[in-house]
Amino acid sequence: MSKTLLIMAAGTGGHVMPGLAIAKTMQSRGWNVHWLGTTHGMENRLVPPSGLPMTLLKFSGMRGKGWKHTLLGMFRLVGATWRAWRLMRELQPQAVLGMGGYVTVPGGWAARLAGVPLAIVNADAALLMSNRALVKHAKRVLFGFDGGAATLGGMAFKARVTGNPVRAEIVEIASPEQRFADRQGPLRVLVVGGSLGAQVLNATLPKALALLPAEQRPIVTHQSGAQHIDALREAYAAVGVQAHVVPFIDDMASAYADADVLVCRAGAITVSELAVAGVASILVPLVVSTTSHQRDNARWMAEHGAAIHLPQQEMTPQRLALLLQELTRTRLLAMAHAARELGRPMAAETIANELESIALPVQGGKHS
């Protein structure tokens, strides 16, 4: 009889995509996988093509919207925990894995109530708020990076640094030495703004490149997101700078392999991909009032010599132009080496091993 894993992941692609990679690995080991998500996150678009059965909870957190929202959120949290507990009674999973998103808190508490071993993945360098609520209930806390958060203080016995799962085609990218072997001419800069486009990158890059003498300008590919592509093309044209502006990049592995350096945000999965691929980067983290995870990710990469951390408030055209002007292929190759040293290409397999180490036997365990 097959074992069952319940994966909890909701909200962003950074939570969902690694969960799908782990699901595929567990299925290859003979496990059944069921997904627990929310009614409004990206899991509703990303999970169905995989064919995984999915249960959705109506829960969207409790922070930042006044005491009435908090009170209502508490009631919804109790209700979501109850529904998750009933699901576990029905599925009788041997293990539960939390990948992040609002669903992990009620799902994690339900796992504790149902007596099912819980593992949580902390993709970022800093400990996620939702994971802080679950650390004491988890059998394993699996970290994407080996920063200070991975010590877990007095609960270090639960912590494992596994890395974050990345796509197979990223793992297969040639080494930095092979890629840089015959490169000549202008540097190749890849700007990645994500599906919605990072507006600070769109606003700054054309102006920064215009400050460079024409003979010193790099070859630029700028992924803008569909919403901003026309305005970005006009911005480059207005300052007389040539750039290949695209809404999306379908083959990201080839784009990574062709680039000397990326300019991008510092989400956990992006940083993990840069490390596994061995690509130098200028990281401009998104910092909002409720979280600084990207800043911590960027600092971690910079401290290891794998990236340049450029805080958004310091990202002026003048500062970026100076950074680009100072970069050489020799320096970028050294950064690419440092990034590659940080990569954990076997993260999905390592996480699968940890799940199997804590799993209940098919016929045993307490589910009450």
Swiss-Prot record:
GO biological process per UniProt: carbohydrate metabolic process; cell division; cell wall organization; lipid glycosylation; peptidoglycan biosynthetic process; regulation of cell shape
UniProt keyword annotation of Transmembrane present: no
Binding-site list for UDP-N-acetyl-alpha-D-glucosamine: T12, G13, G14, R167, S195, I249, Q294
A GO molecular function held by the record: undecaprenyldiphospho-muramoylpentapeptide beta-N-acetylglucosaminyltransferase activity
Cystine crosslinks: none
Similarity-based family: Belongs to the glycosyltransferase 28 family. MurG subfamily.
Catalytic activity of the protein: di-trans,octa-cis-undecaprenyl diphospho-N-acetyl-alpha-D-muramoyl-L-alanyl-D-glutamyl-meso-2,6-diaminopimeloyl-D-alanyl-D-alanine + UDP-N-acetyl-alpha-D-glucosamine = di-trans,octa-cis-undecaprenyl diphospho-[N-acetyl-alpha-D-glucosaminyl-(1->4)]-N-acetyl-alpha-D-muramoyl-L-alanyl-D-glutamyl-meso-2,6-diaminopimeloyl-D-alanyl-D-alanine + UDP + H(+)
SUPFAM superfamilies: UDP-Glycosyltransferase/glycogen phosphorylase
Gene Ontology CC, one term: plasma membrane
Protein name: UDP-N-acetylglucosamine--N-acetylmuramyl-(pentapeptide) pyrophosphoryl-undecaprenol N-acetylglucosamine transferase
Keyword Cell cycle: yes
Keywords linked to the UniProt accession: Cell cycle, Cell division, Cell inner membrane, Cell membrane, Cell shape, Cell wall biogenesis/degradation, Glycosyltransferase, Membrane, Peptidoglycan synthesis, Transferase
EC number: 2.4.1.227
Subcellular location(s) of the protein: Cell inner membrane
Gene: murG
